[in-house]
Amino acid sequence: MEVLTKEALLVKNALLNKGIETPFKKIYEKNKPDIHKISKYIKKIMDLLNLDLNNDSLSKTPNRIAYMYIEEIFSGLNYNNFPKITLIKNTSKINDLITVNNIVLNSTCEHHFLIFEGKAIVSYIPDKILIGLSKINRIVDFFSKRPQIQERLTNQILVAIQILLDTKNVAVAIKAKHLCVKARGIKDSHSKTLTLSLGGVFKSKQNIKKEFLKDF
């Protein structure tokens, strides 16, 4: 079993303490899902749908889905995959707004296991620590690679960055289109969902909140 990085442990414990961690049944790092077992159950589902698993086009589908779940679209369930974080001392005393916008995200609705996709914007006002800009994108990507609801995803990103940078002054917004809304039920192909999570001065000062949202 791999040892989690200090940053991964900090973030994981913070989410647990705030009650916004993804609802795990067991500790994932000790019980990594078995691709072969998942493949077997996918095969059973396909068989119950009367699909011919001897067909060349379908025969490898159970293995493909199992691999995709564990190694790709749900890889964020495993904190061993938490990105390596570059933290920098704020020796330049930077205290202005830093924003990364147009962060493309793809996640999976935990209710129907259908994709939702959109963009995120993340801002923070540094105190003693700065973070490498690409690491913000990687944090968004890590938490997106789970069965999710958009509201919790937004909060998880916020808390992760607050903990790593030791500041409350963080804001996260996500605007996404959900395939579970587009492809089933109401079948609305136009609507998008906007979620906000604000901390520190982003919540208490309207001018800073307005600045954060101006290009979103």
Curated annotation (Swiss-Prot):
It is an enzyme of class 3 (hydrolase). It comes from the Bacteria. Zn(2+) binds at residues 109, 112, 180. Its EC number is 3.5.4.16. It catalyses: GTP + H2O = 7,8-dihydroneopterin 3'-triphosphate + formate + H(+). PROSITE patterns: GTP_CYCLOHYDROL_1_1, GTP_CYCLOHYDROL_1_2. One of its GO terms (biological process) is tetrahydrobiopterin biosynthetic process. InterPro entries: GTP-CH-I_C/QueF, GTP-CH-I_N, GTP_CycHdrlase_I, GTP_CycHdrlase_I_CS, GTP_CycHdrlase_I_dom. GO terms for cellular component: cytoplasm. Pathway: Cofactor biosynthesis; 7,8-dihydroneopterin triphosphate biosynthesis; 7,8-dihydroneopterin triphosphate from GTP: step 1/1. GO terms for molecular function: GTP binding; GTP cyclohydrolase I activity; zinc ion binding. Keywords: GTP-binding, Hydrolase, Metal-binding, Nucleotide-binding, One-carbon metabolism, Zinc. Pfam families: GTP_cyclohydroI. Toroid-shaped homodecamer, composed of two pentamers of five dimers. PANTHER family: GTP CYCLOHYDROLASE 1, GTP CYCLOHYDROLASE I. Belongs to the GTP cyclohydrolase I family. HAMAP family: FolE. This is GTP cyclohydrolase 1. The lineage of its organism: Bacteria, Pseudomonadati, Pseudomonadota, Gammaproteobacteria, Enterobacterales.
